[in-house]
Amino acid sequence: MSDALKPLIGAAADRPLTRAEAEQAFTILFDGEATPSQIGGLLMALRTRGETVDEYAAAAAVMRAKCNAVRAPEGAMDIVGTGGDGKNTLNISTATAFVVAGAGVVVAKHGNRNLSSKSGTADLQGQMGINVMVGPQVVEKALNEAGIGFMMAPMHHPATAHVMPTRAELGTRTIFNILGPLTNPAGVKRQLTGAFTRALIRPMAETLGLLGSERAWLVHGSDGTDELTITGVSWVAALEDGTVKEVELHPEDAGLPVHPFEAIIGGTPEENATAFRALLDGAPSAYRDAVLLNAAAALVVADRAADLREGVALAAQSIDSGQARAKVEALSRITQDAR
């Protein structure tokens, strides 16, 4: 163990760390050179003062540098949320990923098990016969052959094991609760990313800009969800050409109706999988409209659609033509063969 982190903990409590200082601090953490007390001290100093964009970018850059990387085709994007919104909705970002892939955009989706939901993305994919616990080689095969791959965080970020026990003991949100969407192992340059609070969308968008993203939408629903909501207004921080612009979006902007929140509440993994299969079959529902809205946004970010209405049409075609279902079946086959 090293004492190099001690002065940085004190500095972090008093003032924002420079990007170089933050990179040094997180390198020490990820190299396993900090004690549990030092890790907790740094994380709580940052949380209490409030993390800066430079600190987010530094932590994410170090985490990316130490990950088990994936080579993704040009133009691949991520569709992901921070999780932690506590709303227990149906699996919207996961379904969106398959619909967007069915529309011809390669999706390199990064995620983890969602401890705040009855059924996270890993649970839904398991119900659909997809093995999420695969390494970079299998993910690369899936991206190239199926046009979609899922990267489970523990399989790609082994260095975070050094901080997990302390995070569990702290039992509160820290910088690590937002690092997942900022540390895609495939290094994608385009993202549709949900945040559990509106306050994070601009700083996360600015962080992705510092990390080299070309275009990204950071979103939060007015109902508290970490995605574009079908129940009313959503807030968006849109990164494009190095600048961030904040806008409000409404389902009607995409030609979609508003639905009550109760219509998108999820259940057990089995119940959510049943809803997902019905969506793939083309059944009309609030769930379908929520997925169409988010898929439309992703297709705009990917430059596949000029606006949300065109994106909705492309997303609906992906579902109704069977292309979205074909992506589920292809990913299941490739990942099961890897067992």
Swiss-Prot record:
The disulfide bridges present are none
**MF-aspect GO terms:** anthranilate phosphoribosyltransferase activity; magnesium ion binding
Catalytic reaction annotation? N-(5-phospho-beta-D-ribosyl)anthranilate + diphosphate = 5-phospho-alpha-D-ribose 1-diphosphate + anthranilate
Keywords (A to Z) from UniProt: Amino-acid biosynthesis, Aromatic amino acid biosynthesis, Glycosyltransferase, Magnesium, Metal-binding, Transferase, Tryptophan biosynthesis
Q: Which residues bind anthranilate 2?
A: R167
Listed binding positions for anthranilate 1 are G81, N112
**Binding residues annotated for Mg(2+) 2, in chain numbering:** D226, E227
Report which superkingdom the organism of origin falls in: Bacteria
List, in alphabetical order, the GO biological process terms annotated in this UniProt record: L-tryptophan biosynthetic process
Entry GO terms, CC: cytosol
How does this chain assemble?
A: Homodimer.
Give a short account of what the protein does.
Catalyzes the transfer of the phosphoribosyl group of 5-phosphorylribose-1-pyrophosphate (PRPP) to anthranilate to yield N-(5'-phosphoribosyl)-anthranilate (PRA).
Q: Which cofactor does it need?
A: Mg(2+)
InterPro entries referenced in this protein's UniProt entry, alphabetically: Anthranilate_Pribosyl_Tfrase, Glycosyl_Trfase_fam3, Glycosyl_Trfase_fam3_N_dom, Glycosyl_Trfase_fam3_N_dom_sf, Nuc_phospho_transferase
Q: What is this protein called?
A: Anthranilate phosphoribosyltransferase
Q: Which organism is it from?
A: Ruegeria pomeroyi (strain ATCC 700808 / DSM 15171 / DSS-3)
Where does the chain bind Mg(2+) 1? S93, E227
- Residues in a coiled coil are none
Q: Which residues bind 5-phospho-alpha-D-ribose 1-diphosphate?
A: 81, 84-85, 89, 91-94, 109-117, 121
Question: Could you tell me the EC number(s) of this protein?
Answer: 2.4.2.18
Give, as in the UniProt entry, the pathway in which the protein acts: Amino-acid biosynthesis; L-tryptophan biosynthesis; L-tryptophan from chorismate: step 2/5
**Cofactor binding description:** Binds 2 magnesium ions per monomer.
